[in-house]
Amino acid sequence: MSKTYHFIGIKGSGMSALALMLHQMGHKVQGSDVEKYYFTQRGLEQAGITILPFDEKNLDGDMEIIAGNAFRPDNNVEIAYADQNGISYKRYHEFLGSFMRDFVSMGVAGAHGKTSTTGMLSHVLSHITDTSFLIGDGTGRGSANAKYFVFESDEYERHFMPYHPEYSIITNIDFDHPDYFTSLEDVFNAFNDYAKQITKGLFVYGEDAELRKITSDAPIYYYGFEAEGNDFVASDLLRSTTGSTFTVHFRGQNLGQFHIPTFGRHNIMNATAVIGLLYTAGFDLNLVREHLKTFAGVKRRFTEKIVNDTVIIDDFAHHPTEIIATLDAARQKYPSKEIVAVFQPHTFTRTIALLDDFAHALNQADAVYLAQIYGSAREVDHGDVKVEDLANKINKKHQVITVENVSPLLDHDNAVYVFMGAGDIQTYEYSFERLLSNLTSNVQ
């Protein structure tokens, strides 16, 4: 295995996961990216994978080059050099589409919940049998002996179209990525095209009106909470501060009781989808049940830490539906605490398109603090929307804060702080953690 894989933009969540997976399969891997720290690079560094600054000297015609989708000749020296010198490269999704042909592949698509569900499916299946997987939180695992491959299937710019998996879950369809999709119908059409490429089994959330219209040549299995019209049904829910317990039926047949140590109704649905897929694929449900109990979650999805007796939750939620799910999970685990949301809107286009929905979602918290909008590299701020526009629509106690001054967050007793966003919301979180630590130091 002398070939070197070079990743242009290796810190991207999907790219870093793929790099780790290929490294673990015995391939030589390196990559390039900006110097700014990103949470995915820790895993790369621990694996001993070299991360270089962008430079045309990084490229060699004998390499297999995989390029992040955001990089073009006008914004990246390596892409420009490759184009000028006839050096071939594949985009992430193009490489993945050909890579998965050697496995029994299982995809997880959907507007929300992809990463958590991919993580759950990967965790369970890899404990049952040798499995390679790619999770959108930057986690990847590879094995030269794996028969199965689990991956996150991303709809943005229809990147999932090169994929033809045997099985796939679609968690939901929702209007997002307004910088690319023109309407909910456009989003549906993308998912419907993807669904037609599944070959053995498609598992969709049956209480999503859009998903009910999905068509596929593969058998379609619906899962949900409602007995009528769904194949896999979760019932007898018991939600507590230690997780969720529920029973699953398949077309009237009791498949037994299951427990997950995660929170929120959405995670019960994620687990039901995983159970349905693995049951249909012929796996022992006793093993599925056993390994669901130990699923601890994925990075930046309801990730908790305690600083000076203060609970801080970090979550990637950046769409109203995701915010509602995250706040629901926080209330399940901490029913007696005040839920304080600290949210950074991600992209101006999404903020404009979903402004009222964001306000409705954030009003599920007891208090709301807003960071300045985090603009995407793909867009320009034309001044059409400001974070104050969102603040004005929030009914609960609210305030706009800066990363330099997060002290207003101290105005709460017995609170859980839920930091949400897909930009650099973690810098606000770290600023708050330093403030809490300094308070203790001063007291001591």
From Swiss-Prot:
The yes or no answer to whether the keyword Cell wall biogenesis/degradation is present is yes
Q: PANTHER family of this UniProt entry?
A: UDP-N-ACETYLMURAMATE--L-ALANINE LIGASE, UDP-N-ACETYLMURAMATE--L-ALANINE LIGASE-RELATED
Enzyme Commission number(s) from the entry: 6.3.2.8
**Localisation per UniProt entry:** Cytoplasm
Q: Which GO terms describe its biological process?
A: cell division; cell wall organization; peptidoglycan biosynthetic process; regulation of cell shape
Q: Which family does it belong to?
A: Belongs to the MurCDEF family.
Instruction: Please give the superkingdom of this protein's source.
Output: Bacteria
Function comment? Cell wall formation.
This chain belongs to the protein called UDP-N-acetylmuramate--L-alanine ligase
Q: Which Pfam families match?
A: Mur_ligase, Mur_ligase_C, Mur_ligase_M
> Which GO MF term does the entry hold, naming one?
UDP-N-acetylmuramate-L-alanine ligase activity
Q: Which organism is it from?
A: Streptococcus pneumoniae serotype 2 (strain D39 / NCTC 7466)
Which reaction is the catalytic activity of this chain? Answer: UDP-N-acetyl-alpha-D-muramate + L-alanine + ATP = UDP-N-acetyl-alpha-D-muramoyl-L-alanine + ADP + phosphate + H(+)
User: Which pathway is this protein engaged in?
Assistant: Cell wall biogenesis; peptidoglycan biosynthesis
Q: Is Cytoplasm set as a keyword in this record?
A: yes
Annotated keywords: ATP-binding, Cell cycle, Cell division, Cell shape, Cell wall biogenesis/degradation, Cytoplasm, Ligase, Nucleotide-binding, Peptidoglycan synthesis
